[in-house]
């Protein structure tokens, strides 16, 4: 990586759906922001880069396999990471879990010293891995992930338990075994026990803090 004053550091956090990725990312962001300030660190969720499906009917949208790499616009994410590294702002897409598509509005993200990426499929794409300074895989047992996913999708995303279970059996678990779990081999750090692993979070904080020196 070129040593430039505006050059941002990219940290990837991957793992199964509901493994604790977002909790680790938000904890690192919150605690490091208190140390260095909001202008120096940010979080980008891979979910924002689900492909636009506005041209499809709602019936077609709900049939999309959202756990397959083809559901993601990784090309746009790759372009945005390169732009941030050049010191340019990006327009972050906004994805609606209710409408199952990308919204028209975007959120402007300014370059930061450290950007934390989090998402299930980040490590499946070699282009994204090349942009990361280091990567983390959150290794949580699938039965725990399923319980968390049911609670989250029913309470926060308006899903029925039957629909969550059907999706899990049809796509979530098979795609985890086919794509996500094998991508663990590319991680620099593997974190067991999900987002409440305080020892792992403290180690990651110490590692990331080095980039602010």
Swiss-Prot record:
Keyword Manganese listed: no
Keyword set includes Kinase: yes
Keywords attached to this entry: ATP-binding, Cytoplasm, Kinase, Nucleotide-binding, Transferase
Q: Name one GO biological process term.
A: UMP salvage
Which is an annotated GO molecular function term of this record?
uridine kinase activity
The record ties this protein, via InterPro entries, to:
P-loop_NTPase, PRK/URK, Uridine_kinase, Uridine_kinase-like
Q: Where in the cell is it found?
A: Cytoplasm
Q: Where is the signal peptide?
A: none
Q: What is its EC number?
A: 2.7.1.48
User: What's any one GO cellular component for it?
Assistant: cytoplasm
Which residues make up the binding site for ATP?
Answer: 15-22
Chief site of localization:
cytoplasm
Query: Which catalysed reactions does the entry list for this protein?
Result: uridine + ATP = UMP + ADP + H(+); cytidine + ATP = CMP + ADP + H(+)
EC class (word): transferase
Pathway noted in the entry = Pyrimidine metabolism; CTP biosynthesis via salvage pathway; CTP from cytidine: step 1/3; Pyrimidine metabolism; UMP biosynthesis via salvage pathway; UMP from uridine: step 1/1
- HAMAP family (alphabetical): Uridine_kinase
Report the NCBIfam families cross-referenced here: PRK05480.1 (NF004018), udk (TIGR00235)
Q: Which family does it belong to?
A: Belongs to the uridine kinase family.
Protein known as: Uridine kinase
Q: Which organism is it from?
A: Salmonella paratyphi A (strain AKU_12601)
